[in-house]
């Protein structure tokens, strides 16, 4: 992946930092609606931007291969899917412990790896 974006990073950049280590040539970006969280991440060298997934600045996401979110509120998942569809990016969700809200959403692939459950919406499946 050339460009990866975490939506709703908050104050937990651990996955993003690990990705940056594992994929040093990829552009890794964090977004959040909280300007204070974004400022704190910027101070530790994380490329981060204030953005609201309900009114996304699509220029931020252009060219992204993957957009992911860890334990997002269920109401933003359809917004992530819509954004991914518009810009041509895969969407990866690591859900809260309860993942029942995916039962009403179509096209998502459920993946279980070492006990971790993730949902993937591939751009090729839309």
Please provide the spans of the model-predicted regions.
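Conserved SAM-binding loop
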Residues: 41
């Amino acid at each position: 992946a050339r460009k990866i974006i975490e939506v709703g990073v908050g104050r937990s950049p651990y996955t993003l930092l690990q990705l940056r280590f594992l994929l040093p040539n990829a552009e890794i970006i964090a977004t959040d609606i909280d300007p204070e969280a974004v400022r704190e991440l910027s101070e530790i060298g994380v490329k981060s931007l204030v953005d609201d997934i309900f009114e996304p600045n699509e220029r931020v996401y252009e060219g992204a291969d993957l957009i992911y979110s860890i334990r997002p509120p269920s109401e933003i998942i359809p917004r992530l899917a819509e954004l991914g569809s518009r810009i041509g990016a895969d969407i990866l969700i690591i859900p809260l412990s309860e993942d029942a809200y995916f039962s009403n959403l179509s096209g998502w692939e459920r993946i279980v790896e070492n006990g971790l459950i993730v949902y993937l919406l591939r751009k090729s499946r839309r």
